[in-house]
């Protein structure tokens, strides 16, 4: 059994701040735990814009605080995401988040991330693996 709190993660290598300066993420469960998924709490900052494309991962996101516009960049369709709303990127959709307020969410990734990932120039997380 693993028990971990946010205070255990803050200011460690599990507390990732993006190079773009638009988000930060607490990586609660990672690939090295070998459970088949990773679990994160992420905050996207108010007034920013982050374009993403999880070409190598499936992501489920549950908003717990704040408001943001989610745009499917492939179709132009937009959704207003508020607390209690979930979205699932089951088709590796290119998408953009535009938080009106600080936007806090819980994210699940499959395959799991290692904790070192940040978006590249295409908004993609590289597919990294943990050494056995």
From Swiss-Prot:
Report the record's disulfide bonds.
none
Tell me the Gene Ontology biological-process terms attached to this UniProt entry. ectoine biosynthetic process
Q: Which CDD domains match?
A: cupin_EctC
Record-level Gene Ontology MF annotations: ectoine synthase activity
| Recorded superkingdom | Bacteria
Q: Which UniProt keywords apply?
A: Lyase
Give the pathway listed in the UniProt entry for this protein.
Amine and polyamine biosynthesis; ectoine biosynthesis; L-ectoine from L-aspartate 4-semialdehyde: step 3/3
| Entry-linked Pfam families | Ectoine_synth
Could you tell me what reaction this enzyme catalyses? (2S)-4-acetamido-2-aminobutanoate = L-ectoine + H2O
Q: What does this protein do?
A: Catalyzes the circularization of gamma-N-acetyl-alpha,gamma-diaminobutyric acid (ADABA) to ectoine (1,4,5,6-tetrahydro-2-methyl-4-pyrimidine carboxylic acid), which is an excellent osmoprotectant.
Q: PANTHER family from the entry? A: L-ECTOINE SYNTHASE, PTHR39289
**The family this protein is said to belong to:** Belongs to the ectoine synthase family.
Identify this protein by name.
Answer: L-ectoine synthase
Which species is this UniProt entry from? Streptomyces griseus subsp. griseus (strain JCM 4626 / CBS 651.72 / NBRC 13350 / KCC S-0626 / ISP 5235)
């Amino acid at each position: 059994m693993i028990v971990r709190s946010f205070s255990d993660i803050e200011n460690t290598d599990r507390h990732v701040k993006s190079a773009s300066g638009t988000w930060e993420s607490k990586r609660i469960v990672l690939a090295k735990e070998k459970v088949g998924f990773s679990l994160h709490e992420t905050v996207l900052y108010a007034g920013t814009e982050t374009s993403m494309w999880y070409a190598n991962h499936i992501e489920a996101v549950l908003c717990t605080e704040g408001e943001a516009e989610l745009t499917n960049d492939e179709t132009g369709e937009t959704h207003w995401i508020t607390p209690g709303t979930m979205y699932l990127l089951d088709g590796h959709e290119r998408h953009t988040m535009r938080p009106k307020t600080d936007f806090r969410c819980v994210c699940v990734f499959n395959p799991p991330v290692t904790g070192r990932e940040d978006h590249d120039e295409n908004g993609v997380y590289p597919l990294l693996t943990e050494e056995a």
